[in-house]
Amino acid sequence: MIVIGRSIVHPYITNEYEPFAAEKQQILSIMAGNQEIYSFRTSDELSFDLNLRVNIITSALELFQSGFQFRTFQQSFCNPQYWKRTSLGGFELLPNIPPSIAIQDIFKNGKLYGTECATAMIIIFYKALLSLYEKETFNRLFANLLLYTWDYDQDLKLITKTGGDLVPGDLVYFKNPQVNPATIEWQGENTIYLGNFFFYGHGVGVKTKEEIIYALNERRVPYAFISAFLTDTITRIDSRLMSYHASPNTPQTSIGFIPIRDDAIVATVGNTTTVY
């Protein structure tokens, strides 16, 4: 269900020739048909969320094709022209290097980088936002970047919730409870849901849910009897908050609305939204 202000609406793309129009329409249809409530104050916030999701998906595919390597934190490496490898295996932005240039270099020179899946997901989030922000804004918000597991800049606002419906552009986690301790890095896999039943995970590539579970199961202890599984934990960029920084030069998606109800009362507690 999509709510704009106090109106429950069914949105649709009005310009079928705009970039990724079919993908955007699919996302809107999924959101409108889900039981989960997606609440926005304005249509511009919805447009930002839609474009953010598309950019997360395209950034995930770009990272997959960049040559970016999978390594444990003990074996991680980065381009020393832009980053310093920390003692724990993270990547610390060098002084006087614009974050926008350093993030873009990961996608341009992926073979010069290697790390684990959690860091890869954060890199994808930064790249998606860079596509929607002015470079000056991005550099101001995300100065002094550190790329390491789930350590991310405090100005990157994320929402993690349990339960809810899966939408393309969501970050979801596969858990492998009986992982072989010799390959503990395969205790789980952070992935971006690409839509059409495919996920991208750094280390496993672009695969279906069943294929990722199979890959994780291959890395269990001998005689394991518990299968890996897709958890119900979903992580998203808080598009409502992050939309404040969007570039005015970013083209807006043209969205029309079929009104369903215009007297909804929306209440949000934590990450749960209810409509009365």
UniProtKB/Swiss-Prot annotation:
Membrane among keywords: no
Annotated catalysed reactions: L-glutaminyl-[protein] + L-lysyl-[protein] = [protein]-L-lysyl-N(6)-5-L-glutamyl-[protein] + NH4(+)
MF annotations from Gene Ontology: protein-glutamine gamma-glutamyltransferase activity
Enzyme Commission number, as recorded: 2.3.2.13
Alphabetized UniProt keyword annotations: Acyltransferase, Sporulation, Transferase
A GO BP annotation: sporulation resulting in formation of a cellular spore
Keyword Transmembrane helix: no
InterPro entries (alphabetical): Gln_gamma-glutamylTfrase_bac
Functional note: Probably plays a role in the assembly of the spore coat proteins by catalyzing epsilon-(gamma-glutamyl)lysine cross-links.
Family: Belongs to the bacillus TGase family.
NCBIfam families to which the protein is assigned, alphabetical: PRK03187.1
Protein name according to UniProt: Protein-glutamine gamma-glutamyltransferase
